[in-house]
Amino acid sequence: MNIMPISEIIEKVTMICKKNNVKRLDLFGSFATGTATPTSDIDFVVYGCDNLMQLEDDLLQIETLRKIDIFDFDSIRNEYLLEDIKKYPKQIY
């Protein structure tokens, strides 16, 4: 099984965001900065989603060999994570 290209993953994520009435979703981390490696995970931060658990469940259904992490911006308390998110966000939805 091949690793799904990030462009295809983002296309699927966009459809899931529409379905879940997400206000905004950003990509951050190595995929946003262009430094991803074959073992990199995909990091997303969500702004405004009524049912975050459903969004996470839907995202986990994407058949990729990469790990997908999703963070609710309003729930983040880790200053280093917040700094990383604010430094190089790439809005995808």
Segments (PLM) and residue ranges:
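Catalytic core of pol beta-like nucleotidyltransferases
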Residues: M1-D26, A32-P38, Y47-Y93
